[in-house]
C-alpha cells in the first residue's frame, strides 16, 4: 500500500452470521436474496462515500459457517460458507471495493455459550492445542485461502482481530478465555504459514494498540496493523511517527473511532497520514457500539475524498 488508503470497517451486516449456517439462520447468510440486497446497499453507500477498502469479519466468534464432529471438534466448513463468501466477492466487485477479511475475532476464545442452539466462542482449544490447531487450519483456513488467494477483490487477510484481549498477561488476566503469549504467537505463526502457502495477498494482525506490536514481532506478516482508541492510548501515541517505531513494514491504522474521541474523525485521518501510516479505516459503517457513528463514518470519507456537497452560498 504505497498511497494513503482510506476506507472503513464494515465490519459485518450481522456479527458472525454473514458467512455460513447457524441455528439462527439454517439457510446460510449473504447468498440469500434478501441479504444480497442489504449487502448491495451497504457496499454501494461506502463506495459512493469514497471508500476503497473495507475490513470485514469472516468467522467472528465461530457461531456460523462451521461443521463439527460428535465430540465438538471442528470438522470443516459448512456447505453455505463459501457460497456466502462468493456473494460477498460479487458485491465487492459490483461496488468497486476491495476487502481486508478478518479470519477470526478474539471472541473465538471466549467461554462457550449456547444461545438458541448456536455455539458462541468456546474455541480456545483450537488455538492452544497443536493438533486441534492443525485441524482448524487444514479444514477451515486452508480451503478459504485456496479459493480466494488470487481474488483481486481481496486486498489482504487479517489473521485475528485484537488478539491481546485473548492473550494472558497482555490484554486479560482471565485464563478461562485466553491463551499464553507463546500459544497465541504459535497460532498466528501457523496461520500465517498456511495462508501464505495458498494466497498472494498480504497478511496482517489487527492489534488493539501499538503498545502490543511485540506480540507479532518476528512473525511472517507483510503489513502491520494497529488500532487507536483514546480509552487505550493518548493522542500522542497516534501522532508518533511510524518511522520511530522501527517496524520496518507498512503500518495500517485498522480502526479509529467515529464517535467518542476528543479528535474529529477528519483530524484523526490527518494525523495518521502525517505520522506515516499507510492508510486508515474508520470504525464503523454498520456496528452498533459506543465508538460508531455511521453518519460520521460516511461523512469523513466524503470529506476526505472531496465528495461533500458544497455549502450553500450566502445571499
Please describe what each predicted stretch is.
Residues 6, 55, 250-315:
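Substrate-binding cleft of secreted/luminal carbohydrate-active enzymes
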